[in-house]
Amino acid sequence: MASITSLNSARAARTPVGTASSGMGPSAQLLSGEALSLVGVTRAFGALRAVDDVSLNVTAGQKYAVLGSNGAGKTTLFNAITGDFPPTAGRIHFFGEDITELPPHERIRKGLRRTYQSSLLFRELTVRENLFLAVRGVAGGRFSFLRARAGHASTRATRDLLERARLSHIADERVANLAHGQQRQLEIGMALAGAPRLILFDEPAAGLSPAERRELVALLRSLPAHMSFVLIEHDLDIALRVVDRVTVMHNGRVLRTGSPSEIENDAQVQAIYMGSRH
């Protein structure tokens, strides 16, 4: 991981986040209001509080990162938001609606999407077919890939997703033959199906080569301006290049929240990240 001080020159050349037109959904205009709100969210496993009284707010259209070293509680927080492991205390609101008790598939239906560190792709199918399954799953009211059919995979929505995921040149390649970074791009493309309101990315940079990381940054920065996302990451370099608000977690709690420049120059954040470098 690049050192914090080495990021200044890269950030100086950074273009505005989320300036691309959407081409998906009813409007590409920036929305106002609150997209995601966590109030006092806690997730305990017995006596252990993996996430302890976390509060944060993501506005509509905002690109947000939750950072932390291994064991900070990032993935547990991710699972609390998705509904896979609901919080044991606190509330979660999604565009003003309390979703704390909703199961994962209902959160997806309301426009919350997610990608995971572990791949959920159909390796025997092509890139185009995987994207088509995502489109059909959302259009059917459920993100149920196994119930969708892979025929007629040249739909307009699928072509649009191929372009957005920057995968048009390998549309008919089987997933099993893709490089790791290309699979990550495909996962992001599938998460874009159905014009989501907010996407959660769980450490998308993990295991990527330098070239793949650059492609990931370009893809994240090309997402529509009206679309919110939350990037769960341990990689400070990646996160600071693509977001406009950051929360840093440490030992399950919020350590700092601020702009990328504020986080980049925070002494405590520097101590944690410089101390955790391999």
Model-derived features: positions:
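Glycine-rich phosphate-binding loops of nucleotide-dependent enzymes
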Residues: A2-H278
